[in-house]
Amino acid sequence: MGCLGNSKTEDQRNEEKVQRETNKKIEKQLQKDKQVYRATHRLLLLGAGESGKSSIVKQMRILHVNGFNAEEKKTKVQDIKNNIKEAIETIVTAMGNLSPPVELVNPENQFRIDYILNLPNYKDFEFSPEFYEHTKTLWQDEGVRACYERSNEYQLIDCAQYFLDKIDIVKQNDYTPSDQDLLRCRVLTSGIFETKFQVDKVNFHMFDVGGQRDERRKWIQCFNDVTAIIFVVASSSYNMVIREDNHTNRLQEALNLFKSIWNNRWLRTISVILFLNKQDLLAEKVNAGKSKIEDYFPEFARYTTPDDATPEVGEDPRVTRAKYFIRDEFLRISTASGDGRHYCYPHFTCAVDTENIRRVFNDCRDIIQRMHLRQYELL
């Protein structure tokens, strides 16, 4: 009779059975999630502000996530119009601030500058026909163009010329941005943005983190289980200064940042894919011959193009020398302090050129796969 007190009721046995089955399902799902997690390549996009990181993410969407639908494109119209407003405001403000100042070729346009400088400064500004007329006329003034040519002396968004040239298209009521418009559109990245995509049944998670100095403290929370870092550099920024202090050379800032990441004790086993970006703008500057690299980096005067350099078809030898000099400045850092546990893989990129990014990312996939296998000690 004493044994009867330990017997379980039918309800208790059923409850325990349900609990065991539930636990099995949870364990099975955890194992499945772990497998998916381990099979996912996590890529962290780092780099100084305005280097083109967000454009790389947009390219991944265009190439691997069916791009942007019509509704998403419509939501970017206001941002693009804001880019036009910011561009013309910045240029006409700089005309009086530069030394020596820049004069209008047609003084009758002064009232248009006064109009632009008195515009309200809020995000949802309503763009009138009057705004477009004044902006277009000013953009055609040779004095405004001359000020634009000196844009390395002040802070101007890269897409200024692109969108100012498209005013007649953007102002239309039925305007829908093209993929190229979306790639060019500049919106400050604040925080951390994740993009998920799949290439040949391989899962990728790409994390885009704001590049301005006050955003970098957020980077450390992204470092856990990263497969590789993609470090993006604005190669054309050799004659510009950063927005944060209007003093530090932008390319030097990128070099310093790269060095701090390369030597970070938490990242000693994570390899870096180096995107030497904005090659189109670098070529424009070098070919124009107005801003000489040696004026900002004196060591360039002694630099010779390496024998193994592979220039693009029809590329000016001056451009080849410039881009390889910038590449080698970064490789000097990686080779000086590398201990063989991580490597630097440089690529010349143009983030607004979809075919270029398609080709470069395809070239990088084998490298990323090897890093992933090494990450889980399978190689």
From Swiss-Prot:
Region (G1 motif), start-end ranges: 42-55
Subcellular location: Cell membrane
Annotated spans, Disordered: 1-25
Lipidation (N-palmitoyl glycine): G2
Basic and acidic residues: compositionally biased ranges: 8-25
Quaternary structure note: Heterotrimeric G proteins are composed of 3 units; alpha, beta and gamma. The alpha chain contains the guanine nucleotide binding site.
Entry protein name: Guanine nucleotide-binding protein G(s) subunit alpha
Organism: Xenopus laevis (African clawed frog)
